[in-house]
Amino acid sequence: MIDRTALLLVLAAVGLGCTPPGETVPSDLPRTVAVLEPSNHTGDPLLVAGTSFLERYALRTERVTVPDVLASEARLQLERRGFTAVPPETVEGATEGRAPGSTDSAVAIARHGGLVGLVLWIDVRRWEPDAPTLPTFVIVGLTAELIDSTSGLVRWRAERRPAPVATPGEVNLGDAYLNAARKVMAELLAPLGPER
């Protein structure tokens, strides 16, 4: 029994040591970033607010989606790390509200809209709550790329493989989605520098 436990511990240590390191952040990154509208490849609209009959018609709540929240959180996290985020109105006008579906389309949209420098493209691949009410976690899988819109080169890339994000105490999906989006963007953009 002891030999089997020791073998499992050794295999776990070796397995953890073989985890590939994340991409290093280039030291010469420009400090101004335009956050493009994130792509949603989940097949679900991922609504945070404006979903119920009451919200839509009585309260006239504007529709808010997970990609909207991710873009907002990305701007906030970038600013906390010393970057200047291009105002969302400027990006919205330049991109005409289009979300890119790939790195190439992100470059094309940025160039067409006259966005120079770096653009951040987020691709949401998986976003699934464990339950429709009282969700305790949301499984999130996405990638983020900082792309030089002039050269078309990806300067930095981060991937979050699908894994649960804890959302304890949240009663509805909208609040759980907000909580998960905040946590994921802080985690994903942390390599870009410490918060200031």
Task: Please report, for each region that a protein language model flagged, where it lies by residue.
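A structural "domain/chain start" motif
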Residues: G17-T84, A190-R196
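Surface-exposed short loop/turn segments
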Residues: T19-P20, R98-S151
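Generic short beta-strand segments
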Residues: P38-H41, D123-E128, R161
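Short secondary-structure boundary motifs at beta->alpha junctions and helix caps
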Residues: E55-R60, G141, I147-E195
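Sec-dependent bacterial lipoprotein signal peptides
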Residues: M1-G17
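Solvent-exposed, acidic/flexible segments
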Residues: R63-A71, A99-T103, T133-F137, E170-A181
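Acidic helix-start/capping segments at beta-turn-to-alpha-helix junctions
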Residues: F83-T103
